[in-house]
């Protein structure tokens, strides 16, 4: 036992050497004092690493400082549960004398909705964490559900002075900006461990992996998230690489190490066994990602914990390979990825893990196991499905939240009550309220390809082509006796105009015009007018026929006679045109013929201009 203690001290020294330059970033949330006026303003507070911070949300409450038990290290005699209609109670406690988690647990049991712990010294804010491997605290830590935060000493004194002076102190805790939310995809990473014999924290981690697997795979398969697993490793100082402690806890000649699972170098599994399995799980993720099925990692780690536990002496390569094969992964590829743990060379996979432990930008170094990082910000709070899902969902840009983030278990749908105070058309069942993880957004909707325009709160009007398909464009419409009329003009505008035969504003009403009464039609002496909805019927007396365009009545026989004479004249004109055309053709042909005959006769007696004059040869005969 003495030897083990010495070894543990040496290994702790190795860890401290590797973490001596670590940069731990305290994750904060905004705290605003809304009253009294004299201390009104914004302040920083450090999010506690237990309980359930309301990531993506906020809480307004009344601050109460107990006169007795001001440190909250024992049960409270009075209740801090708020009355119906009153603001939630936020209990202010002093630091010291007991664990932070115990203070919050006692406050939760007394009915407080949140806890502020005032520091007892002037120093930069720190993160309130859970006790390490404390069996008694494990009983209540996992049951803490309220959020908590540490505040500076001077700010705490101001709050206490205001309360003791009789002022009502109201504050607003805001976690909406605790996680960046730049776009529609969340990048998150989990720093975990394959060791299942490291106590309470390992048990909590195993349960979390099982519970969160389903949600994680839905998010990953849908392309909503990009998940990366990580594993913390340390190195053994070069001077101790040949020591028993380094040989049992490290691979690759002291380059990559993990603590002994049972904290006993002489029994059970060694730390190097944990490092090898951690490496295998990293390679499972790498190979699965290459096949575009990165979510299979969740299946492997949960199956391995069930099928290959240390307690049953199955924490080995053979059991791991059986799990890998059952998931359809290539064992040879994974073995090749792992490399040789006994070689005196660097392992590229584990070297990347050591480099990744060092914080970059706003993210601090990873020093707590397990650690969840969402959009490059370290998560603070209970490692529980609902709490972690809230943190991840708060990383999506508004209105891009996947369905899993909008379930009743994760958030409250503010659109269900009075439509969130947004515009709505109950008739068409259309509303501007959009439920998001951070709360409702009033935004005019897009329905069936038609965009509504407006402020989203009081007005949303359809516009553009196709608008008449949506609740008739907000215009008047009616149907009677099989006839339908609409005041909507589908010309890309927003105008409503009563159709022909109606008058009105086109929006709320269009009244039928009585053309007969108003003498707008059917006014000829022989006409008989009867009004109809949206039009009129006009008939003529006797055998007369009504011509609507001329608003007149004519005789059917006269009409027929006119039609006959019209046909006669059409035929006659056609014949005349044919005869005239024929005569012109005949005349043209005769003239051509006569011209040719006359020219032929004249050509016999005299030369014509069109003929070439030939040479005149005279023959002289000489005797």
Swiss-Prot record:
Q: Topology: which residues are Cytoplasmic?
A: 586-623
Q: Where are the transmembrane segments?
A: 565-585
CDD domains assigned: EGF_CA (cd00054), PA_VSR (cd02125)
Any one Gene Ontology molecular-function term assigned to this protein's record? calcium ion binding
Give me the disulphide-bonded residues: 415-433, 422-442, 444-460, 468-488, 475-496, 498-510, 540-553
User: What's in the GO CC field?
Assistant: clathrin-coated vesicle membrane; Golgi membrane
**Biological processes, Gene Ontology terms:** protein transport
Keyword Transcription in the entry? The reply is: no
A Pfam family annotated for this UniProt entry: VSR_TRX
Q: Does the keyword Signal apply?
A: yes
Sugar-bearing residue positions: 143, 537
| Database matches in Gene3D superfamilies | 3.50.30.30, Glutaredoxin (3.40.30.10), Laminin (2.10.25.10)
Signal peptide start and end residues = 1-22
Start and end of every EGF-like domain? 411-461, 464-511, 512-554
- Function summary: Vacuolar-sorting receptor (VSR) involved in clathrin-coated vesicles sorting from Golgi apparatus to vacuoles. Seems to binds preferentially proteins containing a N-terminal NPIR motif.
Entry domain remark: The tyrosine-based internalization signal may be involved in trafficking at the TGN.
Q: What is this protein called?
A: Vacuolar-sorting receptor 1
Organism of derivation:
Pisum sativum
Gene name of the record: BP80
